UniProtKB/Swiss-Prot annotation:
Keywords: ATP-binding, Kinase, Magnesium, Metal-binding, Nucleotide-binding, Selenium, Selenocysteine, Transferase
Protein name per Swiss-Prot or TrEMBL: Selenide, water dikinase 2
Active-site annotation: 18
Gene Ontology molecular function, alphabetical: ATP binding; magnesium ion binding; selenide, water dikinase activity
Protein's job: Synthesizes selenophosphate from selenide and ATP.
Name of encoding gene: selD2
Source species: Peptoclostridium acidaminophilum (Eubacterium acidaminophilum)
Textual note on the cofactor: Binds 1 Mg(2+) ion per monomer.
Broadest EC class assigned to this enzyme: transferase
Family to which this protein belongs: Belongs to the selenophosphate synthase 1 family. Class I subfamily.
Iron keyword on record: no
Catalysed reaction equations from the record: hydrogenselenide + ATP + H2O = selenophosphate + AMP + phosphate + 2 H(+)
Length: 347
């Protein structure tokens, strides 16, 4: 690992990664009074809680705009920078776009060694370079708790935008990364996980969704979203509601990180899981699935994978291509049904 400073970034914050986000119920209350924005050039706004905004520039180009930042979930500054940048870039990939420019968003306590911040920025810059985008500046705030992320702009052809609202009955669902980052990160903070598991979760969180998104080219994909702070079921529910369908999730096919099940059984769970569960569970039908597995499905993810809705007949070929392109999981985890009483059915 890079970053030799002996510092416990995770001990400087009350919540880590995407688990630090405001819960979906409280966020919905805050957003209820905002005016709706209408513009014929705005292809994707916040009406369906999508991953990024998309604005048509001309017949051949649309601008993707997004930002994301959060608190540390690992102690190594360089790795924190990599993970935060990967998470920020993911929203562009979820719209099947190409990131072009990025700007740093930094909150950092000025009483600490600035070389620590330098390592965070270096980790972020390396991921921006890997993405093919250009880092062009940023903004800083002196804050008690460190936070880092990016504002990212990307490009996509207006006719090729994939939102979270296009899933169709008969589609299969593919997930491209294992889940459980919130639970495992909580275990890491308490020094309750093995070193091999720490290395695994860091690798997963730092992995760009670029490679999974590039594999979509040539397939008739209907909908995409990325799995982050509202957990697998939270983002799946947004896709279901936006598309007017029900998603049936096969719990046994969900890829889960090492030690996540054991930690969940012990109750080593971030507060964000409970917020997600409270907000979503009334729209979820659970059929004989154990409580600890459901907790993992509600677990807030940091830099999670893509959830892709694709016609059933193309699903296996797409999953195989994703794997060959470098995806960490690419598992078929469910299917899309016509609208039923609940948005999500877990079997």
């Amino acid at each position: 690992m890079k970053g030799s400073k002996e510092i416990k970034l995770t001990q400087m914050v009350t919540a880590s990664g995407u688990a630090a986000k405001i819960g979906p119920e409280d966020l919905a209350k805050a957003l209820v009074g905002l005016p709706k924005m209408f513009d014929e050039r705005l292809l994707v706004g916040f009406d369906t809680s999508d991953d990024a905004a998309v604005y048509r520039l001309d017949d051949d180009k649309a601008l993707i705009q997004t930002l994301d930042f959060f608190t540390p979930m690992v102690d190594d500054p360089y790795l924190f920078g990599q993970i935060a940048a990967s998470n920020s870039l993911s929203d562009v990939y979820a719209m099947v776009g190409k990131p072009i420019v990025a700007m740093n968003i930094v909150c950092f306590p000025s009483c600490h060694d600035m070389s620590i911040l330098g390592e965070i920025l270096k980790g972020g810059a390396d991921k921006v370079i890997e993405s093919g985008a250009i880092l062009v500046g940023g903004h800083t705030v002196d804050d008690k708790e460190p936070k880092y992320g990016l504002s990212v702009a990307g490009l996509v052809h207006p006719d090729k935008v994939l939102a979270n609202s296009g899933a169709r009955p008969g589609d299969a669902l593919i997930l491209t990364k294992p889940i459980g980052t919130g639970i495992v990160s909580t275990g890491m903070k308490a020094a309750m996980v093995q070193k091999s598991t720490e290395d695994e979760v860091v690798k997963i969180m730092a992995h760009l969704n670029k490679y999974a998104a590039e594999a979509l080219d040539g397939f008739n994909v209907n909908s995409v979203t990325d799995i982050t702070g509202f957990g697998f079921l939270g983002h799946a529910a947004e896709m279901a509601k936006g598309s007017g369908v029900t998603l049936e999730i096969s719990s046994k096919d969900i890829p889960i990180m090492s030690e996540a099940e054991e930690l969940a059984k012990m109750g080593i769970i971030p507060a964000g899981m409970y917020r997600n569960k409270k907000f979503i569970q009334s729209d979820v039908l659970c059929e004989g699935v154990s409580e600890h597995i459901m907790d993992i499905l509600y677990d807030p993810q940091t830099s999670g994978g893509l959830l892709v809705s694709v016609p059933q007949e193309h699903a296996r070929a797409l999953a195989d291509k994703m794997t060959s392109c470098g995806s960490l999981a690419a598992k078929i985890v469910g299917r899309v049904l016509s609208k039923e009483e609940k948005s999500i059915i877990v079997i």
